[in-house]
Amino acid sequence: MAKKSKQLCAALEKIDSTKAYSVEEAVALAKETNFAKFDATVEVAYNLNIDVKKADQQIRGAMVLPNGTGKTSRVLVFARGAKAEEAKAAGADFVGEDDLVAKINDGWLDFDVVIATPDMMALVGRLGRVLGPRNLMPNPKTGTVTMDVAKAVEESKGGKITYRADRAGNVQAIIGKVSFEAEKLVENFKAFNETIQKAKPATAKGTYVTNLTITTTQGVGIKVDVNSL
């Protein structure tokens, strides 16, 4: 514990808490101050000036990062017949119907993404209490309820991330791993930021992005200058 505190203090000394950094500076600092003994995840956290209580100000979606996430997602697909075969051919880790529902209800959760064809949603709906709180419920807005299961599987395996604003207007997302070259992380950030900017509700007033930080697993939050975006 003392060693971890020492590492944290060393990281804090390199970061000026009163300063808002450019994206490039923040990424460089995130890599430099990371003290995890594993390949830590690099994340961004936005605070948006939106009112998610209003239907037209809810932000949710998915995108594929240009350089991936550095993580291999375990993909589960609910499909039958030809669509099930398409999912398997595309690289899905688990494909099934009632058998998977029973397994999940018994407590099995060894997967990261759930995809379903529209005709399977009545079945998948039985898992709402299990999948919903874990943000695993398939949804058309994130491209996980679709007839094009092959594309959905390939995207999920190739760096697709999902995002959603919480009740306070916070949006968090992975943009890669500490082991990524800084340029790759910056490219991923810029792609995600462009998506967030395009998602700005027409009815949102005032400054859209009120706060933005970049951090690593167990790392220190580094404030990004929102005016530099």
Swiss-Prot record:
Keywords: Repressor, Ribonucleoprotein, Ribosomal protein, RNA-binding, rRNA-binding, Translation regulation, tRNA-binding. GO terms for cellular component: large ribosomal subunit. InterPro entries: Ribosom_uL1_bac-type (IPR005878), Ribosomal_uL1 (IPR002143), Ribosomal_uL1-like (IPR023674), Ribosomal_uL1/biogenesis (IPR028364), Ribosomal_uL1_3-a/b-sand (IPR016095), Ribosomal_uL1_CS (IPR023673). Transmembrane segments: none annotated. One of its GO terms (biological process) is regulation of translation. Gene3D superfamilies: 3.30.190.20, 3.40.50.790. Belongs to the universal ribosomal protein uL1 family. This is Large ribosomal subunit protein uL1. It comes from Streptococcus pneumoniae (strain Taiwan19F-14).
